[in-house]
Amino acid sequence: MSNSAAVTPNDLSAFWMPFTANRQFKKAPRMFVGAKDMHYTTSDGRQVLDGTAGLWCVNAGHCRPKITEAIARQAAELDYAPAFQMGHPKAFELANQLVQLAPQGLDHVLFTNSGSESVETALKVALAYHRVKGEGSRFRLIGRERGYHGVNFGGISVGGIVSNRKMFGTLLTGVDHLPHTHNLAKNAFTRGEPDHGLDLADELERIVTLHDASTIAAVIVEPVAGSTGVLIPPKGYLQRLRDITKKHGILLIFDEVITGFGRLGTPFAADYFGVTPDIMVTAKGLTNGVIPMGAVLVSSEIHDTFMQGPEHVIEFMHGYTYSGNPIASAAGLATLETYKEEGLLQRGTELGPYWADALHSLKDEPNVIDVRNIGLVGAIELQPIAGEPTKRAFSAFVKAFESGFLIRTTGDIIALSPPLIVQKHHIDELVDGIRTVLRAIP
């Protein structure tokens, strides 16, 4: 059977798909069989414009030869090397390049295989760091309502999406949550950072007072919350969190799995907002989504704290079979080179105003209650159908696919994050397509 041959529902039962209504999908499957640059090819031969960079990850566009050829060369030369007590050059080279790209002071890298693993790694680093310092009482972790930090137990514990948590009973103990910053009444149709909501950062002081600073290890937030609907921080909010965490000796972790590698027009959101965390979590765009890989960057102060014991003792009991995998490292190096050569990390700044104008032209379309944007990411929030939340946005998703473009929905929000190679005519096509869809769905 060719890769473009039709797939019948009987072929689909074995794969229990993630974050998918499996029975619904398998009655009317939507299949991709190819991709190039800004487009997917479906199993029936249609071209679909990618408005979401896959799942927020294909920042350089699909099937870029520099990246795919680097993977093929590496697979033929060195397919696997253990990272425990052994090494290979490309992992060290990639770590060095990440440090050069990252905000000053984030000088050491731990490799993982996904954003979820990167979050787990960051949380473990934070807890262990305080123990090594003799501050074992610092066991609490602070997340945020509507935050998404992957699907492992640490991530869903500090995460704040109720539907991701409620099925699994008791999660990590000692976790608290900041309030989210989304306020439609005051901030609807804002371009960039909202004016209202800075005071919500001061809720961290309340949490510190409630639990005592001596019990809190770290605060973790997404600089821009992506998976919950593109929630952009109010002006000054992240700096206020930074000030409070420093005041109380609490580590600040930025989850940049989505915002990293150019999404906001800077290498990282930390650069955009001018706020440097103690730990930064990345994945997705690190390898352009071609192969699983994540990276956690930590400050020299954290790293050096672990390096105080005898040299023959393992400093941090953590890692993965595929940490710094040779093929993933080759993909990461080729991806970073592509970003640099093509100026992709700056595209969000260059195209941001055009992107904003295009998105906000949807303001008066049916059922639109908010449009928000920053860099090359945006969201269109829809009025839910009474008694049927999520149905309107999902109808838009299906209609969009049928019309030749891919969008992402979360709740009743359409989220957009095109590959950074996007051109103005792609933006026009995407936004005009969404306009047509909004007018067509109930």
Question: Could you describe each region identified by the protein language model?
Answer:
Residues 2-442:
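Conserved N-terminal phosphate-binding loop of PLP-dependent enzymes in the Aspartate aminotransferase
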